[in-house]
Amino acid sequence: MPTINQLIRKGREPQKAKSKVPAMEKNPQKRGVCTRVYTTTPKKPNSALRKVAKVRLTNSREVISYIPGEGHNLQEHSVVLIRGGRVRDLPGVRYHVLRGVLDTQGVKDRKQSRSKYGAKRPK
């Protein structure tokens, strides 16, 4: 614990908040190119094959991002837009791919929560 004299000389330094999405560099979304599209398994106690993509961003950072929704058309060299937001049961996955933007198609036959999956209004 510092003495009063030390506090007068130096003062307390406010703690800096560390970003949860450093690769975004304070941007809401960022564009990138898929370098690898694959499936991975979640942590215990969940079980599934989660679709993820390794993306090289325009700031030349490589990140792993989750592809939400049922079915996707992404492959290597697809251009995608990513947003922040981690997937709790996939360690190291801190970003989401935006559906219905650039090379990513929206989810087919989606009736509810369409805006989150880039699906147009059904006729």
Curated annotation (Swiss-Prot):
Record Gene3D superfamilies: Nucleic acid-binding proteins
Pfam families according to UniProt: Ribosom_S12_S23
UniProt GO cellular component terms: small ribosomal subunit
Keyword tRNA-binding: yes
Record key words, sorted: Methylation, Ribonucleoprotein, Ribosomal protein, RNA-binding, rRNA-binding, tRNA-binding
CDD domains associated with the record: Ribosomal_S12 (cd03368)
InterPro entries (alphabetical): NA-bd_OB-fold, Ribosomal_uS12, Ribosomal_uS12_bac
GO process terms (BP): translation
Coiled coil, from the record: none
Residues carrying 3-methylthioaspartic acid: 89
Keyword Ribosomal protein: yes
Subunit: Part of the 30S ribosomal subunit. Contacts proteins S8 and S17. May interact with IF1 in the 30S initiation complex.
UniProt record similarity statement: Belongs to the universal ribosomal protein uS12 family.
Protein task: With S4 and S5 plays an important role in translational accuracy. Interacts with and stabilizes bases of the 16S rRNA that are involved in tRNA selection in the A site and with the mRNA backbone. Located at the interface of the 30S and 50S subunits, it traverses the body of the 30S subunit contacting proteins on the other side and probably holding the rRNA structure together. The combined cluster of proteins S8, S12 and S17 appears to hold together the shoulder and platform of the 30S subunit.
Protein name: Small ribosomal subunit protein uS12
Species this chain originates from: Rhizorhabdus wittichii (strain DSM 6014 / CCUG 31198 / JCM 15750 / NBRC 105917 / EY 4224 / RW1)
Gene name in the database record: rpsL
